[in-house]
Each structure stands twice: as structure tokens, then as C-alpha cells.
Amino acid sequence: MSRPNTRNKNKRQRPDAVDSSSQILRKIHEANDVTDDDINQLFMIWKPVCQGCRVNTRDNPNCFCGLVPPLNGSRKSGLWQKTSEIIQSLGPDPTLDRRDSESTPAGLTNLGATCYANSILQCLYMNTAFREGVFSVEVHVLKQNPVLDQIARLFAQLHASQKSFVDSDAFVKTLELDNGVQQDTHEFLTLLLSLLERCLLHSGVKAKTIVQDLFSGSVSHVTTCSKCGRDSEASSKMEDFYALELNVKGLKSLDASLNDYLSLEQLNGDNQYFCGSCNARVDATRCIKLRTLPPVITFQLKRCIFLPKTTAKKKITSSFSFPQVLDMGSRLAESSQNKLTYDLSAVLIHKGSAVNSGHYVAHIKDEKTGLWWEFDDEHVSELGKRPCNEASSSTPQSESNGTASSGNITDGIQSGSSDCRSAIKSEVFSSSDAYMLMYSLRCDKQENQEGQKENPIDITKGEVKQLKGGYLPKHLSEWINNMNAVFLESCKQYNLRKEKELNALTERRQEVRTILSEAAVQSLEEQYFWISTDWLRLWADTTLPPALDNTPLLCSHGKVHASKVNCMKRISELAWIKLESKFNGGPKLGKGDYCRDCLMDGARMVVSSDSYRDRRTFMKSIANDVLSGKCEDGMYYISRAWLQQWIKRKNLDAPTEADAGPTNAITCNHGELMPEQAPGAKRVVVPENFWSFLFEDALKVMSEDTLDCTCFPVDSSQCCHCTEVLSEVACFEDSLRTLKVKQRQNHEKLATGKGIPLTPQSRYFLLPSPWLVQWRIYINMTGKNSSSAPEPERLDGVINTLKCKKHTRLLERLPELVCRRGSYFQKNPSTDKLTIIPELDWKYFCDEWGGLMENGISAFIEVGNTDQSSSPDVIDLEKDSSPDDNMDVDAQQLILRASPEICEECIGERESCELMQKLSYSEGDVFVCFVRGKEAPKAMLEASDSSFEVDRRTSKRSRRTNYGNLTSLKVSATTTVYQLKMMIWELLGVMKENQELHKGSKVIDQESATLADMNIFPGDRLWVRDTEMHEHRDIADELCEKKPGAQDIEEGFRGTLLTGNISSEAC
């Protein structure tokens, strides 16, 4: 049982509309009248109104499906695209940048690599005392100090701006920071506080010392003599600090790092201390002692270490724990009566494994609410009651005045010393990315009965405005209010434009759906109008459609043409009135506006086409008989090739341009019959009736610039001029064929490319190999294309190019010889620039190609002893056979001499220029093979010594060897060896320090040298071995932490206001 045909089961079976239209037109032609039924059939008016087609049907004027998407659908563009995409065309939405609430902090924009500055600025701003100190700076001081003015404005925006983030561009430009280079947060904090301290010197008492009062502490470096017990004179000197730098390597907690920072260092041996009291070098101890602590203490965790082996910096990513509450009373050198209990207030985090890259974020505690916030540039998110997402534990902290506890942490509980009088239970947080810690001194309660905190800096009511529990000076308040007003106005205007756009969009969509629902004409008797489908699609899919345009539907008489039925739709009178009244245009094409004249002309053409098609079918049968040789009553010549193409063409209703010129191919330039021996001039004889049909069609379609269709009866004579030319060509080809045969006989071995055995004491001549190749192609080409092969140049000119003009000596090196089975041959005749030929062949060449016997470059082979001194034109024999074959030449050598001799001076100059050009490549491929083992195979060493041809294409199979695959690398002459090794590291996984790179037997180890310096050319094959001497590391470390060279010196904040020696007026 055969399978049912289901290939077309889902395709709509369309009636043969063309045949039915032709029948109607034939009927109109016979009746010479057009009826309403004919109009209904020709214009497809009879077709039903569609109800939900997948796409719009072109041949049904009553189909309005697919002009708009379904109710919940959308399109990629136009009126029906998604609402969100239309809103995007309005531009950025400023309401998205609005701050969620007054209690939510604002972020700072990242200008490229300014996350380090953003983190520090947020930490300073979130400190209430410092923020209010900045706000208290007098106006005249701000005008004299641009840095103070910009930080005050920045804090004012963070404090009261309606935007969720603040642009820090003005502050960064004022400091002259490079926003494309990431810097260290600790260095930035120290330099910024120092700069602000200088800028505040001319401020009032309230803010003059705010930096020192909040962030500055003091330490002293104490050296104690172990013999007399006295401290050195320098031990009494105190140094100020903004942050304590603590070691992290090998330490797991803040408590351990503080112990390490304050630990005793023994000075003994070669490191003994010279005691002034003892007047001798003695053993001593040295330590750091904390003298005073600031209200805000900052710990810088030294996560960056220097690796001597790689001369690079590396980040320590081990986990580090720190407590929520820190007791520093026991750490002071002198006991204090005040409690020195600090609460964790900020954690700066550096994300990333490299030192010179990555990203800084800050976790900061809100002093008022106690909630922690994450500040990630523009994005600010609430963290809750804990700063870090990593695990934490509860531990008691010692409050005793003795040494701080440093016991082990077990099950989350830290065991304190037995001297502890009380303990503060505190959470301990841990982080592998924490880079800086800030602790704030816990003060006694300073709240009044109303529960509001007292303002620590006295500011008069006339100078400030209270916002969110904070204070803004009047000038900053007015400035920020104006800025907020502009921002809120932009939000308002955007919302108005958005609302207007959406309302217009909804109204327009509803209009389209309403009119399309009323467009269908329900019966044949109703009045209807024609409308262009293209305009209807445009109207239904654009927000602002153009004026109504029905002109594409009109014929030359200004009526509706029946051929446009696929380009128009039939709509109701109600729909037409709505469209015409709103979009104007036209013309108005109603029920009776069809063109009767065009219909009658179309009917006549259909009848005429039927007659032409029948005649052409009959003529095709005659043409087939002509080509098969069955036609005996031929009277005229036509082109055989043209007739073959004519038969293959479809049976059309009227002649086309292809029917012109049935005799053009057999007509010569003189207008006569071309000889049949000419290319493409084959002809056939056709009957008179067939010729008349073809001639009639040719005249109908022939254009003015086309040649006349020449008639050639069978008794026409061939063109005598063309016949004579063809005869001359035939004679020339015969003589050329004879000449080539003779040259092949004279030079049998050279013509076939066979090797010519060489004998000592015989005379030979040297020919340029390119000339010999061209000659071989010329004499071996036969057949129709033999005369098209270019002739070789005359020998005199070719030989002269081989001699230098200055010394008239040979400009090419002599070819090498090889011994094979007792005979001597030229080693590489296919690649050598010169080819050795016998004397007889040179004599024949001189006679055939215009050479002079005495002008040739002669060569002869001599047998000499190995101890004889060789001249520059001597080529040693290369033994390419077994030892048994060369027993008679062990103590002697073959010497190839040339006359004239080779010119070493000119050849050296030319080779130097060629080498310089070859080493100036901008792009090329070198091939690298990874070799396992101590030595490379011999094949690799030989392959490495030779280079690939630059333009030669090689397959993958040809590059595959028994020692592995070659890896292709794109390089240039200026590529350094360091860059090449980095490419090898990336592709083969061999670390740069472990690469032993070779070209042949030569080691390539100068990383700063270029490939041109090392004579590495495109196509060279290199090999590399892994020494495994150094421990493996990630290539990302090398890319991010490459050694600073002359062009990569770390400049830090050099060139900015942070390091400039400026006066306070210029701050």
C-alpha cells in the first residue's frame, strides 16, 4: 500500500485565476460587452469576507486580516510595537533616577575608574560630625578654596538631592584626578585628609580642626636598651597618623594583627642598637606605642605583597575576621580614664584577584538608624544589621586595662584572659576582600528629653535649614533647592509627554481597529470604494500616516485597472467617508469606476496571444526537424546555436527581445555570410515559412540600435575577405606547430623537465629558471590555444639582466650539485634561480631565440682536493647517496665554476635590501610546536631552519608531523618576544618563565627584542619546551600585574592637587 501524499495538505488550493480571467476576457471579446458578472469575476468581488486568516490574502479584495495584530499582540516596529519600546523613544526617564525616600542614601557616579574615591567620600559623608563640620565652613572660605567648595556641594547633594545618585565629575576635575586610572583607597584618604586639613586653616574655630579632631591619632617608635633599660631620645617623639597599617599575611583576625603591630622587635647581632647612655652597641627592643587615638580610627589591611621572583604584586585573599565592637583601652601606652570602646562603622571592600584592577565598594553603618548600607557607585542597597554577607559569630571582648585577649576561637566563643573584669559580647565578621576598616568611638548618650541628638557644632538658625535631621547652610540650601526644582520639573515634563504619547497611541490604535471592523462590504448590491492596499497597510501600522493615495491603482485613462486587483481592497462607504474626511487625498474610486477601454484591449490581447502561441507551437516542431536533419526543403540559413536556444525558451504569448537576430552570429563584419569554419558560425537550413515567422518576430522586437536581421538564402556566398583571413590563420598555426615540434626535438630533456646528468670537465651554460619555465609552457601548448601562449623574451636581454652593470659579473648564486647513484645532478632545479643546461642546448637556443654564443654564462665542473682553497664561485658537492656510491670522491670535491664569476659585492647589497624588506612585514603567521622531552626531533630542527614561503598555502595535513601539530600565531615584525611568549602561554598553557623557545637550534630568550631583531620571518617554524622550573600561575596575574617598565611607572596621584605644593588659598 502506497503512502498518501501529505506534502501539500496544509497549503491552500488556489484556483487557476489566470485561466479563469482569460476565459472571461475571451467572452468579453466575443460579446463586445462587459457585464456586472464579468466585473465581479475579474475584480474578485465575489470572494467572501475573510474571518481570521493568518496573513492578508492579496487576491481577495474583501480580506482585511493581518493588517493589525491580535488584541494582545505586538510588532517589532510601528504603531503596534510594545508600549515600553515606544516610551524609550522619549529618551531617558528622569523619574527612574529619583531617590526612593529621604532615609535612603544617594550613590555617586563612576566616571571610569573612580570607585576608590566614591567609597572614601561616602565614608566621610556618612560620618555625621565630619559632614556637619564641612557644612559649617564659612562662605568666604569656600570661595577661596575650590576643593572645600566642591566637597561641600557634593555633601549637600548627597544630603538633600532628590536624585538617587550624584554626579562626582566636578569634584574629580577640581582635584585633577585621572578618572581612567584606579588608585589605592588608603593613599587617597590620607592625601585628601591632609589637603582638607590645610584648606581649613583659615576657617572658623568650629571647623578649623575637624580633620585632626576626628581622624588623627599619634604613635611613637620606642627603642629600649636591654642593658640600662633607658629609652632612646627619639622614643619621645610622636608621629600623627590617619590610619594604622596592619599586616594580613599569616594573620586571621584584627586582634592578631594589632598584636603583631604592637609587638616587640629584638635588635641583636648585626642589628644592635647604639645606646648613648651605655656608649656602646647593645641589644635592644623596639616597638610601636599608641599615644592617642582619634574618635574615628581607620585600619588599613595590607593585602598587597611583593613577589621577588616575578617582580610583581599579588593580593592576599585569605579570610580575615574583625569584631563589631573593639576595645582599644588596653592598647594605649598610657591608661586612659575614659572608655575607649569603638563600634564598627565602615568596611571598604576590594573585589577582584589582581592588585591594580578590580572594584571598590563600601559597607557603611547609618549612625542614626544603625542599618548597614552597601555603596556600589550609583547603586545603594540596604544590608540590614550586618555589614558582610559572610558568616559571623558572637565573641566576648576584654574590657580590662591589661593586655587584650588573643585566645583561640572555639565554637564562636573567644576565651579571654583571667584578668578580664567584664566582657562585651560582640559579633565577629569575616571577609576575604575587606581592605579598610573604620571604627567610631562609642560616646555617652547625648540625647535630650525629646530624644533628639544635640548638634555638636553650634550653628545659628539663620544660616541653616534642617533636612532629614541634619543641617544645611543657607547658601547650600538655596543651591540644592534650585537643583531639585529643575530635576522635579524635568520629571514632571517627562510624565506629561509620556501620558500624552500613550493617550495618542491608544486613541490611534482604537481608531484603526474601529475602521477595519466597519470596512467589510457585506453584499454585492451595497455601495463600495476601492483603496490602495499599500496605503492601507501604511495607515494601519504608523502613528502619523500620509494623505490617502489611490494613484497607483489608476490606468492611463484615470480609471481602475483590472490588473491592480491584487493591490487594492474593497471597503464600505462608511469606512471610506471616515478615511477621506481625516486624511483627504484620493482619487475617489467607486463601484463603477472600472476602465472599460482597458478591459476591451485586454480581451483583444488574450485572443491575439492564443493565436501566436498556437503558431509558435507549430514552428517548434519544424525547428526540431531542422536540428535532427529531417527537413529537406530548406531555403534560408540561420545560426544553429541561436535556434537551439530558441527551442528551449517557453511558449510565450508574444515575441521577446531574445527573438531578435537569428542570423547575427553568422553575419561577419562586412555584412556577408561568415565562413562556417569561423568560431561560433555553425548554421542550419530552415524552410521558407519558418524563416518568415522568425523574421516577422525579429522585426517586432528589434530596437533602433540593433543590427538588421540579414537574410541569407542557401545560394549565398561566403565572405571572401573572412575566408582569406581564416586561411592565413590556418597557415600560421601550421608553421607554429612545426616550429614547436622541432624545438621539442632539439631540447628533449629540457622540454620534459627531466634531470640532466652532469660530468666533470664538460662545458655547460646557465639560464634563468623563470625563462626556461616560460619557454617550456610555450612549446608544450598545443591545440586551439597554442597561438595564445606568450613567447619568451629574447635571450640577449635576459642574459644581460643576470650581470651587474658595475662589474659585469654574475648577480645570482650558483646552484648546488648532488650525487645520486654515481651520477651528478643539479640539486633543486625547480627552486634554483639558475638552471644548468648542456652546451648543445645553449647553441640551439641562440639560433632559435636570438642569443649570442659568446655572451652566455658558461660553467664547468672541476674535480679538486679538499685542502684546496675555494673561491667564492665554488660550490661543494652534497652527497645524497649511500657511502658505497661515493667511494671515489671521498678525498676530492666537485667545483662548479662560472664565467663571468659571481659578484659578491652586488649580491651582498641586494640580499641586505631583501632581508630588510622581508623583516618589515606588518602581518604574518609563525608556527609553534610544543615539544615534550629534553630535545626536539631532528625533523623539527631541520624544519625550523627553513621558512615557509609567505604566499604558499599549506594544508593542515601538510603541517601535521609525528611530533605534534603546529599552532599558527598572527605576528608582525615589531612583535616582541615577550608578546610572542604571552601568545604561546595563552594557546599552549606553558607559563612564560618556563618557556624554552627555539628557532632551529637557536634559543630565543631576549624578551625585549622584536621578531625582526631575532630574524624570525613569516612562515618560520619555532618549537617550545616546558622547563617546569617555576610554579604554575594564572595568566591573568601576568596581564594585570605586568612589571612596570619605562612606560608603565606607577605615578599614583602625581600631577593632582592631592600632591601639589599649593597654598591654602588654592585648595
From Swiss-Prot:
Family: Belongs to the peptidase C19 family.
Tissue expression profile of the protein: Expressed in seedlings, roots, stems, leaves and inflorescences.
Gene Ontology biological process terms from the UniProt entry: protein deubiquitination; proteolysis; seed development
Region (Disordered): 1-22, 385-418
Protease in keyword set: yes
Assigned keywords, A-Z: Hydrolase, Nucleus, Protease, Repeat, Thiol protease, Ubl conjugation pathway
Alphabetical list of PROSITE patterns matching this protein: DUSP, UBIQUITIN_2, USP_1, USP_2, USP_3
Residue ranges occupied by any Ubiquitin-like domain in the UniProt entry: 948-1031
One family name in Pfam for this protein: UCH
Domain DUSP: residue ranges: 503-595, 610-711, 738-861
GO MF annotation: an example: cysteine-type deubiquitinase activity
InterPro entries per the UniProt record, alphabetical: DUSP-like_sf, Papain-like_cys_pep_sf, Pept_C19_DUSP, Peptidase_C19, Peptidase_C19_UCH, Ubiquitin-like_dom, Ubiquitin-like_domsf, Ubl_USP48
Biased composition (Polar residues): 390-418
Every USP domain range: 106-442
Protein name: Ubiquitin carboxyl-terminal hydrolase 26
Catalysed reaction equations from the record: Thiol-dependent hydrolysis of ester, thioester, amide, peptide and isopeptide bonds formed by the C-terminal Gly of ubiquitin (a 76-residue protein attached to proteins as an intracellular targeting signal)
Annotated localization: Nucleus
EC identifiers of the protein: 3.4.19.12
Compositionally biased tracts (Basic residues): 1-12
Active site: 115 (nucleophile), 359 (proton acceptor)
GO cellular component terms, semicolon-separated: nucleolus
Biological role stated in the UniProt entry: Recognizes and hydrolyzes the peptide bond at the C-terminal Gly of ubiquitin. Involved in the processing of poly-ubiquitin precursors as well as that of ubiquitinated proteins. Deubiquitinates H2BK143ub1 of histone H2B.
Top-rank taxon: Eukaryota
